[in-house]
Amino acid sequence: MIGSLTGIIEEIYITYIILNVGNVGYIVHVSQRVLQTCKIGNNIKLYIETHVNRDNLTQLYGFLDKQEQDYMRMLITINGINYKTAMSILSKLSPEQIFSAVVSNNKNAFRGNGIGEKLAGRITTELQYKISKMPIEETLIIKEDDSLAALISLGYDKLKAFNAIQEIKSDFPNANIQEIIRKALQKLSQ
């Protein structure tokens, strides 16, 4: 297994790059978001997910950060999602957007590129459970929002706390953290 590769980008294609690591060119499939950051000749470090397909061919999937890799791993555990479909989701949505779509039960965010209504519903349902079981520091939002960390430390459910905070932020966009926590506590205790 390969954990990560650091090398020079030699070639860029529609869904993958060729990464030169020690004079060996690796074909690494990446999301469109990663492709946008790639320039030929640049040095890059990618976290790697290795997959052996039906034809016994090894395929490498690269990610700029571990969070995107974790979301890929979660997506491929869902029945009906393969690596190609997961990469198309990650090309369309950032991990933060996936998290947001899941906690707000926004099935439409996942539709398109071969994903119909049933599969989109399965994605939101199954990821809600998986996201709620992730360690707090991996939920992405915690880094930006101390109010969520405070509510979780008080024993509130991560998804319910997130939804309450999002609602308060939309109603009171200029509220500081203390006000958000106070209003969220009121909302969650109803």
Curated annotation (Swiss-Prot):
Region (Domain II): 65-142
Domain notes: Has three domains with a flexible linker between the domains II and III and assumes an 'L' shape. Domain III is highly mobile and contacts RuvB.
Organism listed in the record: Ehrlichia canis (strain Jake)
Stated family: Belongs to the RuvA family.
Record HAMAP family: DNA_HJ_migration_RuvA
Protein name: Holliday junction branch migration complex subunit RuvA
Gene3D superfamilies recorded: 5' to 3' exonuclease, C-terminal subdomain, DNA helicase RuvA subunit, C-terminal domain, Nucleic acid-binding proteins
Record GO cellular component, one term: Holliday junction resolvase complex
Keyword tRNA-binding: no
Region named Domain III: 143-190
InterPro entries reported for this sequence: DNA_helicase_Holl-junc_RuvA_I, NA-bd_OB-fold, RuvA, RuvA_2-like, RuvA_C, RuvA_C_sf
